[in-house]
């Protein structure tokens, strides 16, 4: 079955909030996702479906020609299948259409799988945010993909 990647809509919000809670210790709320859809000039989200099942999501917070990559979440049983790569490539393509040239993100320093994915997509580590994450406390790598 092929992965369908498309813009997040109202119909995706509950499944997105559930996926967020499954993947993160401090997840976005359903209301936060609702609020982001009301600000399409700032937030850009994409979701990935296999059949009727939401299996991944990712977003951008856009500011002029830069964007923060946020909320990259893939259901555990669907990781390492290229879904996140396809999702992020589509998200950055859509961001570029809106004038975004440079992308940044924070990732847990111990999340080696995600770091390898971001490096494969052209991101480079440019710094550390000490004790950035809570539950558990962990440093964040600051990564950039610059045009």
Segments and roles (model prediction):
Residues 7-77, 88-90, 94, 98, ...:
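Acetyl-CoA-dependent GNAT
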Residues 9, 75, 79, 106-110, ...:
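Residue-level recognition of the GNAT/N-acetyltransferase active site
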Residues 69, 102-107:
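Conserved hydrophobic beta-strand within the GNAT/NAT acetyltransferase core sheet
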Residues 80-93, 116-120:
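Conserved acetyl-CoA-binding loop-helix of GNAT-fold acetyltransferases
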Residues 88, 111-114, 131-136:
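Short glycine/proline-centered loop/turn elements that form peptide/ligand docking sites
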Residues 106, 124-140:
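Conserved catalytic-core motifs of GNAT/GCN5-like acyltransferases
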Residues 139-147:
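Terminal substrate-recognition subdomain of acyl/acetyltransferases
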């Amino acid at each position: 079955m092929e992965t369908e990647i498309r813009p997040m809509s109202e119909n995706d919000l509950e499944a997105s909030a559930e996926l967020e809670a499954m993947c993160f210790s401090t997840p976005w709320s359903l209301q936060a996702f609702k609020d982001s859809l009301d600000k399409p000039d700032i937030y850009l989200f994409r979701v990935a479906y296999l059949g009727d099942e939401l299996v991944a999501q990712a977003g951008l917070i856009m500011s002029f020609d830069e964007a923060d990559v946020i909320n990259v979440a893939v259901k555990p049983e669907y990781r390492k299948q290229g879904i996140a790569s396809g999702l992020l490539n589509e998200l950055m393509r859509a961001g570029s259409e809106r004038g975004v040239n440079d992308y940044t993100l924070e990732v847990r320093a111990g999340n080696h799988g995600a770091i390898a994915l971001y490096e494969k997509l052209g991101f480079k580590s440019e710094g550390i945010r000490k004790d950035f994450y809570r539950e558990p406390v962990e440093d964040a790598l600051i990564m950039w993909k610059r045009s």
